[in-house]
């Protein structure tokens, strides 16, 4: 009887240890996924150029930055999950937009399959063309004609990046892109709330495959990063310590 009781206790402890190990493994994997999916440091800091540095000289550390409070990812269509924008920051005083564009290594595999290639696209090469398209309202007094079916009232203008910094982290590939000449904010009210320009209806990020680049065709993916009238997702902020350090370093060059 004693031997049977001892055996039962051993089996019970073994089962508990096995269950504990399984729980620990699952939690470990989840934590790794959370930590590994965060943007690398190079992708979370403002990338200085002459335009933003001039604005910083005028405004100092009170330089206003408008950024999204959430990631933006393609959630439907043939390129579902291929691309995302993890940060989009408008700097009104510099007429500038900076975004952090991200895609998974699996995107290289799926895009290769979409284009009939035998092997996944090689990591580290310049496969994708990333631009910004802005929809301008040519008749801001009439809100009933603000769609693509009214080309006489809505104009689309494409902006090319003026700078690009690349990085990788685990399974992800990143690009920090700067776009100059983009002015979506007319100023700020007494409470510091941005006054958005009513003639700018929306701001999109378009992704094309460089081997099949044709702006007259549909892009591989499109991400909406700003929509007039939906300013709830836009947060007003100022440069953090890393941004200030980067701007100060740029000014010393």
Q: Where do the protein language model's features map onto the residues?
A:
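N-terminal Sec-pathway targeting helices
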Residues: 3-24
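Alpha-helical, hydrophobic structural elements that either
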Residues: 16-19, 29-253
